[in-house]
């Protein structure tokens, strides 16, 4: 039901702008063929899961295109897409075919045994700066795009909590699930003091938001929002490909 919140906005944009296109991705069938049987069995240990992640062997198969928007980061003309549990290679290929004017880059994070959504792992803060989960670092080979375009990738601060709140299925790394409002302003969960301190030292104005009790509904500040409209011009942040 998330789409119901911003559907009135889309309706307004459609009516105001003759160039606005309202499109939807193909809805997957989600049959048993989309998943590897017993992949999530409790009998499988963490080391095996980390090995599978490094080998890009995930619970989802390549039966049909699958992707979640929360696995995608948009940097102007470039889409950075996490290949993992909720986005497969066919899903990434669908994005490439559909958005021909954009460059689509697949990334993965070997340190995450359950790679679901990118925004508690890899978070752009402002032009030229990204914080990366220190337990799920972007592989060296995949850093080249960022490095040759002058982007710095630094470790995110440690979470303030040792475990998530009751009924929350996300990790403690929702600490870095922040909401950037503009190049100087960022919203951080009120109790995440270490992440707030790091961003303050990086020159950001930090706005504390009390949201931890809502984590059980599916995530943090970034998870709770959808940027349906962005102000400004379309910029090429990675001219050196």
Q: For the regions a protein language model found, what residue spans apply to each?
A:
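The feature marks the mature, well-folded catalytic cores of soluble enzymes
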Residues: 1-241
């Amino acid at each position: 039901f998330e789409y119901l919140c911003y559907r009135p906005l889309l309706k307004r944009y459609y009516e105001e702008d003759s160039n606005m296109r309202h499109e939807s991705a193909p809805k997957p069938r989600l049959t048993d063929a989309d998943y590897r049987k017993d992949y999530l069995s409790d009998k499988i240990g963490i080391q095996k899961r980390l090995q599978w992640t490094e080998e890009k062997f995930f619970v989802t198969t390549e039966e049909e295109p699958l992707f979640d928007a929360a696995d995608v980061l948009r940097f102007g003309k470039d889409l950075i897409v996490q290949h993992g549990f909720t986005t497969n290679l066919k899903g990434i290929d669908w994005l490439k075919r559909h958005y021909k004017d954009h460059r689509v880059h697949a990334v993965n994070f070997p340190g995450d045994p359950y790679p679901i959504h990118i925004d508690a792992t890899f978070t752009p803060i402002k032009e030229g700066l990204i914080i990366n989960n220190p337990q799920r670092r972007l592989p060296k080979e995949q850093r080249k795009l960022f490095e040759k375009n002058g982007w710095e990738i630094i470790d995110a601060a440690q979470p303030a909590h040792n475990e998530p709140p009751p009924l929350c299925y996300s990790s403690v790394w929702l600490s870095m699930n922040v909401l950037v409002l503009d190049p100087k302003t960022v919203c951080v969960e009120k109790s995440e003091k270490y992440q707030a301190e790091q961003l303050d030292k990086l020159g950001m104005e930090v706005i504390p938001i009390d949201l931890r009790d809502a984590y059980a509904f599916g995530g943090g500040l970034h998870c709770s929002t959808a940027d349906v409209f962005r102000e400004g011009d379309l910029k090429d942040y990675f001219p050196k490909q």
